[in-house]
Swiss-Prot record:
The lineage of its organism: Bacteria, Pseudomonadati, Pseudomonadota, Alphaproteobacteria, Hyphomicrobiales. This is Aspartate--tRNA(Asp/Asn) ligase. Homodimer. L-aspartate binds at E175, R221, H454, R495. Aspartyl-tRNA synthetase with relaxed tRNA specificity since it is able to aspartylate not only its cognate tRNA(Asp) but also tRNA(Asn). Reaction proceeds in two steps: L-aspartate is first activated by ATP to form Asp-AMP and then transferred to the acceptor end of tRNA(Asp/Asn). CDD domains: AspRS_core (cd00777), EcAspRS_like_N (cd04317). Transmembrane segments: none annotated. The record marks H33 as: Important for tRNA non-discrimination. It comes from Rhizobium leguminosarum bv. trifolii (strain WSM2304). The gene is aspS. One of its GO terms (cellular component) is cytoplasm. Keywords: Aminoacyl-tRNA synthetase, ATP-binding, Cytoplasm, Ligase, Nucleotide-binding, Protein biosynthesis. It is found in: Cytoplasm. GO terms for biological process: aspartyl-tRNA aminoacylation. Belongs to the class-II aminoacyl-tRNA synthetase family. Type 1 subfamily. One of its GO terms (molecular function) is ATP binding.
Length: 596
């Protein structure tokens, strides 16, 4: 018999009754029922119930074991009585009658519980992550993450992609976040950077004649902590294709990702045909470029119904500024004054002056609008709004006014709030879509200049002609995001493979041709030696797994994450370098300047 086990803790079945076996694992819990000891022994695969009664030769040793001790047990497999069968366990029809117990490793008093799923301070969980990972839910999440990545690799291979690896030590590149820098010992005073993404390398692979590249790519960004992103590093399914349009990318990756989602969705419906929603339409209908399509609320402009109306606030805004619009947020089943007042109070808590509303109710067999706005604009306009939005008895509508570029985010938040409060969101499904036709440029208030809105390596729609003849802020990009349930899960584009167009695009944001050659020299040179049209995307693995397992944050699906202060509490990183290390790198630390 093997030194440690003949079976795992999930393997034994009724067909093994009468066999003498050996299992090893962690003591999940010990129970004493009338002098008979029951030990649940756990390993990576599952749990087996072990029994030791006073007649067992292993009883005395069984009395000494404690939770999370690692032990080996030899015993006889017995069938459970019918009334003790546990159908919730794979091994629930049998139990192991202990004949010999060997303690392989005792455990100190635990700093956090492993049995069960009690809330515990996150810093304690991260410091003792090796214990935290023994918890059932977190352990399953990590296994599921590995399975999802394996499925992605399999599906990518099935549609002709090949996995290539790209360098981890590379040059610094302005891609929207700070780089993690690595000092060079051989070249004092110079630094490598950890890649924010393999963007330039995957494009260079296309120029080099490869096609359909992918990799499970680690990405590193020195960003301030955010609730929806892991500090330090994250992983993405990175891909690139040659001789493709954006439709080719969508037609390839949409069905592929639907297949991956369906494999792990546990029966929840998954979008098969992903809608393609232009960015401007997404902002207008949902107030967001990552809309949660499980929420049925669709906003509409109702400006005409308030122009010249008796509601002087909105009417005055419309008359004095042609950019002003009134957006309606229809809320089916929200037609009570109590709910409308709650929404208004919520808006004020968000720093807004309030949230105008109308709700409809039947009185004396007549459907009437109620609320201050209805009184001010009159029955005819109120009914026109109701008809436009398809509302009826027991429904409500909220209104946001101003210049859309200034209020659309709040309007989107109000849509989300109303959908959640009214339980309109179906949480047992995965709604996926493409958001397309992103703006290529945006105005930076901070720098008072035009800047790239997203990926600077995207191809502008209209190409060089658009850059030379259009207002930059009207130019769209061949750029797209994939969105699931209100989360961005991918971003991609058709790339700008023309040196002339590349230089013209960067000139719009204040960079010269020399700047382009200095910062993106490898890519710029490559494009002058025959570059195919190419495009791709990157899918965020961490976020996809988080959605699939229903985790509340990204740390619940990552093996050894940092905390929100970008610290690895288990390994003690970051940590000071030794004087010897600093001398070898020709580096002298400078204390940070204290801010007043």
């Amino acid at each position: 018999m093997h030194r440690y086990r003949s079976h795992t803790c999930a393997a034994l079945r009724k067909t093994d009754v009468g066999s003498t076996v050996r299992i090893s694992g962690w003591v999940h819990r010990v129970r004493d029922h009338g002098g008979v000891l029951f030990i649940d022994l756990r390993d990576h695969y599952g749990i087996t119930q072990v029994v030791a009664d006073p007649d067992s030769p292993a009883f005395k040793m069984a009395e000494t074991v404690r939770g999370e001790w690692v032990i080996r047990i030899d015993g006889l497999v017995k069938a459970r009585t019918e009334d003790t069968v546990n159908k919730a366990m794979a091994t629930g029809e049998i139990e192991l009658y202990a004949q010999e117990i060997e303690v392989l490793s005792a455990a100190k008093e635990l700093p956090l519980p492993v049995f069960g799923e009690p809330d515990y301070p996150e810093d304690v969980r991260l410091k003792y992550r090796f214990l935290d990972l023994r918890r059932e839910t977190l352990h399953k999440n990590i296994v599921k993450r590995t399975q999802v990545i394996s499925a992605m690799r399999r599906e990518m291979g099935n549609v002709g992609f090949t996995e290539y690896t790209t360098p981890i030590l590379t040059a610094s590149s302005p891609e929207g976040a700070r780089d993690f820098l690595v000092p060079s010992r051989i070249h004092p005073g110079t630094f490598y950077a950890l890649p924010q993404a393999p963007q330039q390398y995957k494009q260079l692979l296309m120029v080099a004649g490869f096609d359909r590249y992918f990799q499970i790519a680690p990405c590193f960004r020195d960003e301030d902590p955010r609730a929806d992103r892991l500090p330090g590093e994250f992983y993405q399914l990175d891909l690139e294709m040659s001789f493709v349009t954006q439709e080719d990318v969508w037609d390839t990756m949409g069905p592929l990702m639907t297949s991956v989602f369906e494999e792990f969705a546990e029966g929840k419906p998954v979008t098969k045909e992903w809608p393609r929603i232009p960015y401007d339409e997404a902002i207008r209908k949902y107030g967001s470029d990552k809309p949660d399509l499980r929420n049925p609320i669709v906003m509409e402009a109702v400006t005409e119904h308030f122009a010249g109306s008796g509601f002087k606030v909105f009417a005055g805004m419309i008359a004095s500024n042609p950019k002003v619009q009134i957006w309606a947020i229809p809320a089916k089943t929200g037609g009570s004054r109590a709910f409308c007042d709650r929404m208004n109070a919520w808006a004020q808590s968000q720093g807004q002056p309030g949230l105008g509303y109308i709700f409809w109710r039947s009185e004396n067999d007549k459907l009437e609008g109620a609320g201050p706005l209805a009184k001010n604009i009159g029955e005819e306009r109120t009914d026109a709004i109701r008809t436009q939005l398809g509302l009826g008895d027991g429904d409500a509508c909220f209104f946001v006014a101003g210049e859309p570029e200034k209020f659309y985010k709040f309007a989107g938040e109000a849509r989300t709030k109303a959908g959640e409060e009214l339980n309109l969101v179906d949480r047992d499904r995965f709604e996926l879509c493409w958001i397309v036709d992103f703006p290529f440029f945006e105005w930076s208030e901070e720098d008072k200049k035009v800047d790239f809105a997203h990926n600077p390596f995207s191809m502008p729609q209209g190409g060089l002609d658009a850059l030379q003849n259009q207002d930059p802020l009207t130019i769209k990009a061949f750029q797209y995001d994939a969105v699931c349930n209100g989360f961005e899960i991918a971003s991609g584009s058709i790339r700008n493979q023309s040196p002339e167009t590349m230089v013209a695009a960067f000139e719009k944001v204040g960079l010269s041709q020399q700047d382009v050659e200095d910062r993106f020299g490898g890519l710029y040179r490559a494009f002058q030696y025959g570059a195919p049209p190419h495009g791709g995307a990157a899918f965020g693995i961490d976020r996809i797994v988080m959605l699939l397992v229903g985790a509340k944050n990204l740390r619940e699906i990552s093996v050894f994450p940092m905390n929100q202060q970008a610290q690895d509490l288990l390994m003690g990183a970051p940590s000071p370098a030794t004087p010897t290390q600093l001398r070898e790198l020709s580096i002298r630390p400078i204390p940070p300047v204290k801010k007043d």
